[in-house]
Amino acid sequence: MSTVAWDFAERRLGLNLDILYPNGTAYNFRVIQDYTTGTQFTIFERYRFCAKQKAPMPEPENCIPGNTSVRFRGFLGAGKDRIDYDLYTMKLTKEETGNLEGEGTFSVVRGTEYDIPLSNSFIGTYFDGETPYAQVSNGGYYNIEIGIDDPKRWFDVPDYCPKELTDLTMIPKHIPKWTWIRLPAPRLF
């Protein structure tokens, strides 16, 4: 499970992610992406380990990408509790994303003041360098709130984080390998 805070006004993202492995091992880590400085911090608080990297590009936008198509319009509920949504699809290319090729879908609740993401999926290929891996991912959004109650929780970088970029080949063995995870340079997924 993951929780996310987007602060588009300050150009930053906070992510709290749990990774569950088939052998029962679980890891939790945080990611802070700050596009004003062009940096990303990956933080394993349990180990007091932090890696500094360049923020993934392109910078996220708070809009529906131009290369999407509405595939379906639907609703949930009825009467005064009815919620209308649109389901979009888009093709992703390795040239555009840097490491993904395939088709993404996402649904957005149409609101009077805000459009709110509802779900997303991707079916295609993830490239680690030139090595391709089949990838299928799905996600859903819930408990969405407008505003960030505690920005420090999401965006404060711990004192033990390095000032210089981290050499990812030198990560200690007790730190789980997270670099294969597509950390967001997202548009809604």
From Swiss-Prot:
GO BP annotations listed: cell-matrix adhesion; flagellated sperm motility
Protein origin, superkingdom: Eukaryota
GO cellular component: cytoplasm; extracellular region; lysosome
Alphabetized UniProt keyword annotations: Developmental protein
Keyword hit for Transmembrane helix: no
One MF term in the entry's GO annotations: calcium ion binding
InterPro entries (alphabetical): Ependymin (IPR001299)
Tissue specificity remark: Endoderm cells.
Name this polypeptide is given: Development-specific protein LVN1.2
